Amino acid sequence: MSEMQPRPNDTLTRHMLYPFGNASFQAKSPPMLIEGGQGVYVTDASGKRYIDGQAALWNVNVGHGREEIKQAIRDQLDRLSYYSLFGGTTTAPPVELAAMLCRMAGPEGMVRAFFSSGGSEANEAAFKLARQYWRHAGEPQRHKVISLKRAYHGVTLGALSANGTQAYREHFEPLLAGFIQVETPHAYRNPFTTDPEALGRLCAELLEREILYQGPKSVAAFIAEPVQGAGGVIVPPANYWPLVREICDRHGVLLISDEVVTGFGRLGSMFGCRHWGVKPDIMVFAKGINSGYVPLGATLMNARVADAFLTPDEAEFTMAAFWHGNTYAGHPLACAAALANLRIVEDEALDRNAAEVGAYLLARLKDVQTRHPHIGDVRGLGLMIGIELVRDPETKEVFDLKRGFGARIADLCRARGVLIRNLADTFIVSPPLILERQHADTMVDAFEAAVAIVERE
């Protein structure tokens, strides 16, 4: 630890309970205080600069300190800081943003947007849309939601119930009834096959089998991330998503694409589902929608879903309305930031940059893997990459987590000016989409040096 910058004092933890944080650990090892950011870099309290290899939390896609976004927020703040979307009022930014989102997701058939304050809330809205859609469609018994094992959809109770990782769930059980998980197509860790096409087909068949077991007339929706994020960057086989769309169509099940991480270019295509050529019924966004400058989430729907809410009942207060909303839904500052952010994404073709630089970064990391046997797998798409350490590359046996190899490597990378996030012994590489090859080289060199040190220890 001698290579690390001095940690801030305990004032950073005395009154703060951090997300997913162990208060006892953080009392001894307070978090690093980030005080500045520009482009792909952030700066700590000592003035040391780091490549932000995690885009904060998968979300600062256009980079830190973008003047276009700051100016958009200032301009909107001068006009109107906040007003609600309730009670027959609205503001211009969410109206303009809804139109822009529906244009961008036009190839997927999206026609309406509903706003919230982040990804968990946006997924809650998706579940409520799905359930109320089926009530309007005359099938109120369709209430179940199927998701994948290892999935992450958020921390609110509905989103948590759709999560497929037990660690997120166990403290809060019993969770909501009607949420079911099926096997995820994890090429590196599955009990079935090493053939990607066979795996995609088998996992799709397991989904269909579960729909049939539950009773198709009881299933409202299937939700999945195009590439699983917090589950370890799990890239499905190419045939999986098209097969899922066919199965959902066959049984009338709504398909929800959770694009909170993958949306707006991270995978090298504007949306994750677009990479697979699949058109969902509902799409969920947050994070990259405005690169985290102001909290925002959005839930988009196609005409099938949206038209169900155009009922003959034209009363202002009616059970036909969508009975859901948040105080800060469509916040004008957040939406103004999103409009500026998405113009940058389109004008600078950041989806294409993610594809090109991401392929280069992935190839370099795979080359590192050939020299370090404890790197069991390197996987990813675009600028969304996972690196998994194993004790035994043949059996894929994991290290004892108490030894903290992943955290040690992340700390050594930090000492070399690179921030990457470790989830136990899997590393998440998800930098801003403006990353250049020179930044990728610095990241890879720091990571390999850190791995080499830990191997010798």
Descriptions of predicted regions:
Residues 2-457:
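Conserved N-terminal phosphate-binding loop of PLP-dependent enzymes in the Aspartate aminotransferase
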